[in-house]
């Protein structure tokens, strides 16, 4: 099953260069990479404004503004000297075929994980996390979820492809343990009986960062963790370019501090999703997503250097 653009076309819209100008590698399974970046240009499961399929391209494009800083502030080292990170381009599927996307993404992830790689993925709408969870659970077993979002995405509407149902489906499939999972920044209606710990945006904005992180670590424990960041967790002042913006969200400063504070968790997979550049202003949403993705890589590099 071919999943990457190099099978027939190296000129993918987002792949003139890799994230942070990192090397492009269209054969990541056989590489010596520690982490592999994959774009998933898919937005058929969105319930709001479409356009998330252009998110991976926007994140890569703006990431050139971050590539010059070797020792990213306030870190004391260059992530690229500790982690071997490559960008393998975008998943290729028949646009309009959600099932094919899901199957190919899961197959791609399973192949990478079996080869000893870890994944950082760029959406695309948030549905792409579900096939990624399926692949990661096959490799790591049941996981904890650390989920930044304005929505819990635990809605049971019966639709197979919906970016609001993944975390209703995932516990039922045994992919994640909601009792060891936490959802951060929520500010929309949700079912309080689904087992997840919800730290809504009001308390996240009002409580101290260290206090929140201590609670997250207590909930997650030593389980393998999948980290997913929906950019609409941020307030629209910091991330207007997304499909379902909700006011009252996190600042970019608070989000970065929280992500940095997850360094000690056993994070086995990560994604940043729901960037829709058609609604962005001066690329601030894409820049926020690229910066958060870079911080995710830095927390992995920090652990490797210990």
From Swiss-Prot:
GO terms for molecular function: agmatinase activity; manganese ion binding. Belongs to the arginase family. Agmatinase subfamily. It comes from the Bacteria. The lineage of its organism: Bacteria, Pseudomonadati, Pseudomonadota, Gammaproteobacteria, Enterobacterales. Pathway: Amine and polyamine biosynthesis; putrescine biosynthesis via agmatine pathway; putrescine from agmatine: step 1/1. This is Agmatinase. Its EC number is 3.5.3.11. It catalyses: agmatine + H2O = urea + putrescine. The keyword Metal-binding applies. One of its GO terms (biological process) is putrescine biosynthetic process from arginine, via agmatine. The gene is speB. Pfam families: Arginase (PF00491). Catalyzes the formation of putrescine from agmatine.
